[in-house]
A protein has these predicted regions:
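N-terminal Sec/ER secretory leader and immediately downstream segment
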Residues: 18, 22-92
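Short amphipathic alpha-helices in soluble, non-transmembrane regions
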Residues: 25, 63-74, 111, 148-157, ...
Length: 254
């Protein structure tokens, strides 16, 4: 993509000017259905922008790869612009580093090939000197798929290759929300608690979220009529280090 001459540097609302530049630079790009931009005018003459290329349905993987390469070069020249691409239900950030962008592209390919995945967002969230920080959010088609995808994202060499520097991973599906623990790791005990109850009783819904005190917290809703006390015992026995951070309630609505 060509970079057009810009007066961004002397714009009072720099974020607005950056967004305008992005739209102009990428306008008319083949296979791009829409361009979405956001602008952040932090202070006079200072700001940033995020630009997302929303690709046409059916855009080939080879074409996506080519556009990713062009976007990587673009953001390398425009450090106040965050470049993103949305293709096949997966939206992801493209960074200037070739290796990191290659990892994200590989994850995009595997997620789009996974029929358990409905959509996903892979976002770069650098903080101070820590540049390798990713936030990944995935929506799965059902609870079983959500847990399986979550596990696969942590399994080295399995279906989805993990990214380096993931800050938080969240996967949700109807009846389940699960995220990495407070130390950005695999919440083994939280998942064990959920699976222990699921193996014995029908589960209406569950939330396995990060918790600053225990690392993870578990909330499980079992079907009405289930022996809740037994379900609590099952869950807490499977996750002894979480203690009262594991809760089980009954679905009173049936």
């Amino acid at each position: 993509v060509l970079s057009l001459p810009s007066l961004t540097g002397c714009a009072i609302d720099k974020g607005t000017a950056l967004a305008s530049d992005f739209e102009e630079n990428w306008a008319g790009t083949p296979d791009v259905a829409k361009i979405h931009t956001t602008k952040n005018n932090t202070l006079p003459f200072k700001g940033s922008s995020t630009g997302t290329l929303i690709l046409k349905d059916g855009t080939s993987a080879d074409r996506v790869t080519k556009l990713v390469g062009e976007m990587r070069e673009y953001v390398a020249r425009h450090d106040k612009i965050t470049g993103r691409i949305a293709a096949d239900g997966i939206t992801f950030t493209v960074v200037a580093d070739k290796g990191r962008t290659g990892q994200v592209l590989a994850l995009w390919r595997s997620l789009t090939a996974d029929d358990r995945v409905a959509d996903a967002d892979i976002n770069d969230e650098p903080w101070k000197e820590a540049t390798d920080r990713w936030r990944i959010e995935v929506t799965a088609v059902d609870a079983t798929g959500a847990l399986a995808v979550f596990k696969d994202m942590y399994a080295k060499g399995d279906r989805h290759r993990p990214l380096a520097g993931v800050m938080v991973l969240r996967v949700r599906g109807p009846g389940l929300f699960v995220e990495s623990d407070f130390n950005d790791g695999f919440p083994a005990e939280a998942i064990a608690a959920y699976e222990a109850v699921l193996a014995q009783y029908p589960v209406v819904g569950a939330t396995l979220r990060r918790d600053a005190v225990s690392g993870s917290a578990v909330s499980i809703v079992v079907a009405e009529g289930v022996d809740r006390d037994d379900a609590v015992e099952l869950a807490r026995s499977a996750a002894p280090n979480l203690g009262t951070a594991v809760e089980v309630t009954s679905d009173s609505a049936g």
